[in-house]
Amino acid sequence: MDISRAEQRILHHLAQGGRIEIKREGKTIAEIRCFTRDGWVYPGVDLELFRKLKRKRAIRSSSGRPYRITERGLYLVRSELDNR
């Protein structure tokens, strides 16, 4: 299954140790933030992209914690060179 360039970027940040945090107002999602492993906020996540990643089972949250990448997500993400 192919993934878009934006999905690829987000999954790569998550594979390196990032997380996606959501804030809710009642049952609706009010805000979505993607944090890199260094704690910086990555601005490329919106509600549509978040739902696509959930639908593809690339990210998952357990016990109310932030969303992390799954094994399926690691399979979908193509490796990239990291300059660290």
UniProtKB/Swiss-Prot annotation:
Q: Which domain of life is it from?
A: Bacteria
User: Per UniProt, what is one Pfam family of this protein?
Assistant: YjhX_toxin
Q: Which InterPro entries match?
A: YjhX_toxin (IPR018654)
Q: Which NCBIfam families match?
A: PRK13687.1
Family as reported in the entry's similarity comment? Belongs to the UPF0386 family.
HAMAP family registered for this protein in UniProt: UPF0386
Q: What is this protein called?
A: UPF0386 protein NGR_c10980
According to its UniProt entry, this protein's organism is: Sinorhizobium fredii (strain NBRC 101917 / NGR234)
